[in-house]
Design a protein with these regions (language model features):
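Short, well-ordered amphipathic alpha-helical segments that serve as non-catalytic structural scaffolds
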Residues: 50, 72-87, 111, 228-244, ...
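Condensing-enzyme catalytic core mediating Claisen C-C bond formation in acyl metabolism
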Residues: 2-69, 169-231, 235-238, 317, ...
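Buried hydrophobic positions in well-ordered alpha/beta secondary-structure cores of metabolic enzymes
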Residues: 26-28, 54, 83, 97, ...
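Flexible, glycine-rich active-site loops centered on histidine and acidic residues
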Residues: 146-179
Length: 334
């Protein structure tokens, strides 16, 4: 750990005062992935199966794994810096930094203040967002609310997790599922991808998906989680579409939490969508928890899949249980 140093506090930034409601949008994306990619072979050998068994059950062929000296904060900083560069935003102009994560390097401090300081956003409000795999959507709602209420002008939202460090290598249910990574988005008034509506939900289901302070690894009832994940994401999407007065046919691309291939396909089938209308990057990345939605957004942009005029529907499900959906609208689409 680097030696502590006493910093001169930056003067507090006066907060914008509330005025009439304005819309928030996304001005740029960024992502960061560890260099090491691990295929199914070593995991399969450890749990006594063939690599194809893992691929068939999960749709995952490989995942990124952080090095021993590579922390969550480093990935978040890299993704955040790339998003700020893509949005042409000076870090000193950022009003808030939110980091959605379940795997911060320390219990305290949270990751967000460290990320903000490293990026040069020293006057920004900063905090971590929980809700596991749903964390990025929760952060999207929080960041958009800050902008819409005129409490902030520029928000850096990062989803980052390194759950390979919290995985039991001998547990067939979870050993092959998780990967590490970070994705980020810069939120500003009237950005290209207008945010909203956002819906979030939850229910108490602790014993079927958790990391406790004793084992410190993910424990999961896979069948129970699968059923509820598909159902709750479908429910959240239908609720959002009703609020937005849209039909699923009005949506150009669906980005569901990249939990595994079976869950992504099940959500797709619930809505009768063709595969090319649903983002699926899980084969190469695995389940990156809070990073999965922003990573998929960044990759979809690079692949030319985000519409110039149209709608992108985001949905996620995580421990808690927690779930949600959010709509991004590009261009002047009504």
């Amino acid at each position: 750990m680097p030696a502590s140093r006493l910093l001169e506090p930056a003067p507090a930034r006066p907060l914008p005062q509330p005025s009439r409601r304005r819309t928030a949008g996304i001005a740029g994306f960024g992502r960061a992935l560890p260099a090491t990619s691990v295929d199914n072979a070593p995991i399969a050998a450890r749990i006594g199966v063939e690599p194809a068994w893992i691929t068939k059950r999960t749709g995952i062929s490989r995942r990124r794994r952080s090095a021993a000296d590579e922390g969550l904060t480093e990935l978040a900083i890299e993704a955040g810096a790339r998003a700020l560069a893509a949005a042409a935003v000076d870090p000193a102009d950022v009003d808030a930094v939110l980091v959605a994560t379940s795997s911060s390097d320390d219990v305290v401090p949270q990751a967000a203040p460290l990320v903000a300081g490293a990026l040069g956003a020293e006057r920004a409000m900063s905090w971590d967002v929980g809700l596991a795999c749903t964390g990025f959507l929760a952060g999207l709602q929080q960041g958009a609310a800050l902008i819409e209420s005129n409490r902030a002008t520029t928000v850096l939202l990062i989803g980052a997790d390194i759950l390979t460090r919290y995985t039991d290598a001998d547990d067939r249910q979870t050993a092959a599922l998780f990967g590490d990574g970070a994705g980020a988005a810069v939120l500003v008034p009237g950005g290209a991808g207008s945010i909203g509506p956002v819906v979030l939900g939850g229910e108490p289901q602790r014993d079927v998906l958790y990391i406790d302070r004793t084992d410190n690894v993910v424990r999961m009832d896979g069948k129970f989680v699968y059923t509820h994940a598909v159902d709750r994401m479908e429910r959240a999407c239908r609720e959002l579409l009703e609020i937005a007065e849209l039909a699923i046919d009005d949506v150009d691309l669906v980005i569901a939490h990249q939990a595994n291939g079976r869950i992504i396909n099940a959500v797709r089938e619930r809505f009768g969508l063709d595969p090319d209308r649903v983002a699926d990057y899980v084969a190469d990345l695995g389940n990156t928890s809070a990073a999965s939605v922003p990573l998929a957004l960044s990759l979809a942009q690079d692949d030319g899949r985000l519409p110039e005029q149209g709608h992108v529907l985001l949905t996620a499900f995580g421990a808690g249980f927690s779930w949600g959906a959010a709509l991004l609208t590009f261009g002047d689409t009504p």
